[in-house]
């Protein structure tokens, strides 16, 4: 409970061979969020099971794209007006959420600029350490990089990801044990994956 992970968003991506990651889905989901989309048809080609979480088969009730799209102008204006503002927050959680198969796991994203670096505080009500965490870290880093590119001259800082409940489902326990066992000897740093040189339209 109340678990926090701190990640340097400037560091190269790290992969472990024992942990198979859907890299196409990871990239597609980040682009899907940044575009403000919530349609099933645009993300389903990259995941065979994701459509099962849609209530009507057409849209996702808890998609992060629409709140990101709608609140991004406020965040950019807020940080441009006062780079030390503590009010640059995107709210993902819905007041009085209705019953749905797609309740958002993330409550909010707060963006803080300190010493010319943008830091992100992600507050999550629930975080699946196996299935969701690796994608959440990537998505929040992409969102932060997107904002930094639009602010110009701002570098990426740290991602503080705090989860009310960070958990591992029983069905993923054995796979997680294998990753922990090989972590020391099979960690791979991919130095080619970096945000450097990107532009807002990339």
What are these regions, as identified by a protein language model?
Residues 1-202:
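Terminal, non-catalytic protein-protein interaction segments that mediate quaternary/complex assembly
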């Amino acid at each position: 409970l109340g678990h926090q992970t701190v990640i340097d968003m400037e560091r190269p991506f790290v992969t472990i061979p024992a942990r198979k990651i859907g890299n196409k889905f990871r990239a597609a989901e980040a682009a899907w969020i940044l575009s403000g989309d919530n349609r099933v048809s645009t993300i389903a080609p990259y995941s065979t099971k994701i459509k099962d979480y849609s209530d009507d088969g057409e849209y996702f009730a808890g998609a992060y794209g629409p709140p990101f799209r709608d609140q991004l102008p406020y965040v950019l204006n807020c940080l441009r007006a006062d780079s030390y503002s503590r009010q640059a927050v995107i709210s993902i959680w819905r007041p009085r959420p209705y019953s749905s198969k797609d309740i958002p796991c993330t409550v909010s994203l707060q963006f803080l600029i300190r010493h010319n670096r943008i830091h992100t505080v992600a507050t999550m009500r629930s975080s699946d350490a196996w299935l969701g965490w690796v994608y959440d870290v990537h998505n929040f880093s992409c969102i932060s990089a997107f904002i930094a590119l639009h602010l110009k001259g701002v570098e990426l800082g740290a991602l503080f990801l705090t989860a009310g409940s960070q958990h591992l489902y029983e069905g993923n326990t054995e796979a997680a044990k294998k990753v922990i066992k090989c972590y020391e000897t099979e960690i791979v740093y991919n130095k080619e994956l970096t945000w450097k040189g990107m532009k807002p339209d990339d």
